[in-house]
Amino acid sequence: MVREKVKVSTSTRTRQWKCVESRTDSKRLYYGRFILSPLMKGQADTIGIAMRRALLGELEGTCITRAKSEKIPHEYSTIVGIQESVHEILMNLKEIVLRGNLYGTRNAFICAKGPGYVTAQDIILPPSVEIVDNTQHVASLTEPIDLCIGLQIERNRGYGIKTPKNFHDGSYPIDAVFMPVRNANHSIHCYGNDNEKQEILFLEIWTNGSLTPKEALHEASRNLIDLFIPFLHTEEENLHLENNQHDVTLPFFPFHDRLVKLTKKKKEIALKYIFIDQSELPPRIYNCLKKSNIHTLLDLLNNSREDLMKIEHFRIEDVKQILGILEKK
């Protein structure tokens, strides 16, 4: 466990955040406590409420969402040679904590032979996913039988609730909890005199191990920034001069000319054969582009600056980073 003394900055200009306590209670329970100061009266509550909602509702997680086996007649049946009922096995699979960056649906498998215990380490996963706690229990095989279960893995946010219509062909949906943050609280400490009251915001974050509290804090902050960016662009896109009927649109980026020149420069190269996963892009940017059906550098350069900024969770800094990578090609 790491704990630091809280030092209050006397400056009213520079806000600083700091991790003042960090500990790992188990493989599936991380804790972190952070401070942000100095803040004016009322600002701590504004930030604290927004951060808590973003931490609990905006972050994505990876979960097992479906299990399939042709030998299972229904969810509440039992199988000879397995101590747990099918329902109990599904509940155990629901508790498996996964860490990974993936887009869409991926398949995984459990293939085990009894007698013995089946744990999370027996799950065969795609390369982009890993298990946080390999010791998590799945089933107990009491006889020399083969247990083969097909699994479906997805990345999403919030809750995934199963519905009766999703039961078919020996396939059983699993109620998924995609939230990597188990809990988040904020508290406020006031200091200073009545004329110059200031606040310190304390944030406490508990995660399931798929993210550290610090990673969760960074991701929630980025998501909040992305949510507010459209409000900044609206004025820039629709600026009207008082004595002129023509719209004047401010450029999105000062470096748009670089994008135009780069497109011309690369015209002779077979960009359609260079895929974006060869360009050393960070996972978040890569996933944003894939979701928008941008698979090659040619796809990317055929998008205008406006098109790129319409991509969900995409930021101006991401375009700068992409340009830097492309100019090296």
From Swiss-Prot:
<dbReference type="GO" id="GO:0003899">
    <property type="term" value="F:DNA-directed RNA polymerase activity"/>
</dbReference>
<dbReference type="Pfam" id="PF03118">
    <property type="entry name" value="RNA_pol_A_CTD"/>
</dbReference>
<keyword id="KW-0240">DNA-directed RNA polymerase</keyword>
<comment type="subunit">
    <text>In plastids the minimal PEP RNA polymerase catalytic core is composed of four subunits: alpha, beta, beta', and beta''. When a (nuclear-encoded) sigma factor is associated with the core the holoenzyme is formed, which can initiate transcription.</text>
</comment>
<feature type="region of interest" description="Alpha C-terminal domain (alpha-CTD)">
    <location>
        <begin position="269"/>
        <end position="329"/>
    </location>
</feature>
<comment type="function">
    <text>DNA-dependent RNA polymerase catalyzes the transcription of DNA into RNA using the four ribonucleoside triphosphates as substrates.</text>
</comment>
<dbReference type="InterPro" id="IPR011260">
    <property type="entry name" value="RNAP_asu_C"/>
</dbReference>
<dbReference type="InterPro" id="IPR036603">
    <property type="entry name" value="RBP11-like"/>
</dbReference>
<keyword id="KW-0150">Chloroplast</keyword>
<keyword id="KW-0548">Nucleotidyltransferase</keyword>
<feature type="region of interest" description="Alpha N-terminal domain (alpha-NTD)">
    <location>
        <begin position="1"/>
        <end position="235"/>
    </location>
</feature>
<dbReference type="GO" id="GO:0003677">
    <property type="term" value="F:DNA binding"/>
</dbReference>
<keyword id="KW-0934">Plastid</keyword>
<dbReference type="GO" id="GO:0005739">
    <property type="term" value="C:mitochondrion"/>
</dbReference>
<protein>
    <recommendedName>
        <fullName>DNA-directed RNA polymerase subunit alpha</fullName>
        <ecNumber>2.7.7.6</ecNumber>
    </recommendedName>
</protein>
<keyword id="KW-0808">Transferase</keyword>
<dbReference type="InterPro" id="IPR011263">
    <property type="entry name" value="DNA-dir_RNA_pol_RpoA/D/Rpb3"/>
</dbReference>
<dbReference type="InterPro" id="IPR011773">
    <property type="entry name" value="DNA-dir_RpoA"/>
</dbReference>
<dbReference type="InterPro" id="IPR011262">
    <property type="entry name" value="DNA-dir_RNA_pol_insert"/>
</dbReference>
<dbReference type="GO" id="GO:0006351">
    <property type="term" value="P:DNA-templated transcription"/>
</dbReference>
<dbReference type="InterPro" id="IPR036643">
    <property type="entry name" value="RNApol_insert_sf"/>
</dbReference>
<dbReference type="Pfam" id="PF01193">
    <property type="entry name" value="RNA_pol_L"/>
</dbReference>
<comment type="similarity">
    <text>Belongs to the RNA polymerase alpha chain family.</text>
</comment>
<dbReference type="Pfam" id="PF01000">
    <property type="entry name" value="RNA_pol_A_bac"/>
</dbReference>
<dbReference type="GO" id="GO:0000428">
    <property type="term" value="C:DNA-directed RNA polymerase complex"/>
</dbReference>
<dbReference type="GO" id="GO:0046983">
    <property type="term" value="F:protein dimerization activity"/>
</dbReference>
<dbReference type="GO" id="GO:0009507">
    <property type="term" value="C:chloroplast"/>
</dbReference>
<keyword id="KW-0804">Transcription</keyword>
